[in-house]
Amino acid sequence: MSNRVFIIAEAGVNHNGDIILAKKLIDVAAKAGADAVKFQTFKAQNLVSKNAQKASYQKETTDKNESQFEMIKKLELDENTHKELIAYCKQKNITFLSTPFDSDSIKLLDELGLSTFKIPSGEITNLPYLRQIGGLNKKIILSTGMANLGEVEAAIETLVKSGTKHENISLLHANTQYPTPMEDVNLKAMITLKNAFGLEVGYSDHTLGIEVDIAAVAMGAKIIEKHFTLDKSLPGPDHKASLEPDELAAMVRGIRNIELALGDGLKHFSKSESENIKIARKSIVAKCDIKKGEIFSEQNICVKRPGDGINPMRWDEIIGQISQKEYKQDDLI
């Protein structure tokens, strides 16, 4: 990744299994200025058992009587759909990403030529999964929701031992609750990850709004991932906790502004304020008329604007010197 923040617009399963909706999501992400749009790749039978229950937030936004398997089955994207979406992303000049949730999906995304793999928080303790992705030697973005430092370390070690270069791993601090309560965000943990592992870090956000994403960038995040939708009122598990198009665009603008605002870290006057030095700073001036030969003292000199004369930091040096010319009141010394 470059110094520019890599913004991932997370479409996830907000396409509701509809390729037309998926393409509209790509349009929105590209128009907003995101760097990538991310989907999810899975086969329901490989991901959950038929008796698996849905999360509480999923029960609130989907049919309460259907199982997690039934919900997810409707959201699968087949191989041809993946190919069509990848081609559409190229047309829109935005990177296609997808999170694989099972072995077959890892193979599919590798065959489709993805150079970056996103590992979700739920797979951070899945040893066979980590070994399979690690063996591909791709760039990896690893979400760390629900994990402690020991689990993150074990996942990194597995990826590296399997063939991934350490420097090709980026870590995303995350909280997997949709939406995440503000008191549970713990953005400082992102810095802990950076200090502990020396890797590029970012934030995968599930809070409502955009302020936490902008704060994360100000704290050093190099990757931001955020769910978005065409309409929060659409049926499906994640729409309600996602940004709508105008909110996504506002987040991207905010992040790009913070990128500029962070600067180079050197303390100096900026180009835009250079002309203000003469206007806002002060110089040593004549407090009253001064004749040639008089001695400068606190009685006949003072400090006033403008700032293009003798710097007042030289006050002690000037006091006691002999005036070499005549000065009128307010003349620069």
Short names for language-model regions:
Residues M1-I333:
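Catalytic cores and adjacent flexible loops of soluble metabolic enzymes
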